[in-house]
């Protein structure tokens, strides 16, 4: 299910590794995918991009790879892990 562009912008800025990433603001998933596949310089950035792209269109095969929650949680630093866990808690409470 696609969410609004504003929702993705709001979520994207919670992941510091994506602050200057192309495709986050304004939201452009194709641009973010290319950046994550070719130019992202650390695991925080790649896993954060994969997470957003998976939320946007889960069935698509993104160039940067599929989001793996277990791998991301192991690789993310504390700030990025917290951003994900905060999102997960909000989604759980909304259901």
How would you describe each model-predicted region?
Residues 6, 48, 71, 93-94:
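Residue-level detector of intrinsically disordered, flexible termini
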Residues 32-87:
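Amphipathic protein-protein interaction modules
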Residues 1-34:
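Short terminal alpha-helical segments
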Residues 13, 20, 56, 81, ...:
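Short linear sequence elements within intrinsically disordered, low-complexity coil regions
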Residues 1, 90-95:
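Short intrinsically disordered terminal tails
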């Amino acid at each position: 299910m696609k969410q609004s562009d504003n929702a993705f912008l709001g979520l994207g800025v919670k992941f510091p590794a994506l602050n200057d990433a192309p495709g986050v603001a304004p939201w452009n998933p194709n641009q973010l995918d290319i950046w994550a596949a070719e130019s992202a310089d650390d695991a925080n950035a790649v896993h954060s991009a994969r997470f957003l792209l998976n939320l946007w269109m889960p069935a698509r095969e993104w160039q940067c790879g599929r989001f793996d929650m277990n791998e991301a949680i192991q690789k993310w630093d504390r700030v990025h892990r917290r951003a994900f866990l905060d999102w997960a808690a909000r989604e759980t409470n909304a259901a």
